[in-house]
Amino acid sequence: AKKIAAMAQSMDLSATQAAEMGESFQLMGVQTDKMEEHILETYKSSQAMGLNATKVIKVLQQSMKSMQSYSFAGGVKGMTSMAQQAVKMRLDVDDVLQMADKFYQPEAAIEAAANLQMLGGDIADAFGDPFETMYLARNKPEELAKKLGDMTENMMTFNEETGEYEFPAEVRMQLKSAGEQLGINTDKM
């Protein structure tokens, strides 16, 4: 209990949030000592990625119950990867899980992939294979989130005048159409 309280304080979680997180970890077979190690590892890897590590921990804590109903490669590590991707892309984990739901059934995956292939480019490359996407949705939703992140990164261009990355107008239109097929609100990205 002392370790959980200390962790809660250092991660800016309430005692209740930390206890709920501890329960979720225990339901997955992760004991308190291992939980502490995992949280510290998550904190360090999130910082190394340039992310707000405390926010990643909070997203993990808030989304753990919904993520437990999916198969993640590597268990808690896969869930952590999903939380990191969500923070990186400014998406809710639930949005990414909705995308996984959309590709869960073969018919829906084939139809969505066909529509995404028509958009071409990075979108077709990322989500054009319905069976790969369906496999990821069923077994590795964190990889599905990574694909989404990689796709959007490849679509950005660097504006040398402003020194910022941006989406050209045609790319924004493609993203909007892709978002409709993926079941994701691209305005949040």
Residue ranges of model-derived segments:
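Amphipathic alpha-helical interface segments used for oligomerization, scaffolding
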Residues: A1-M189
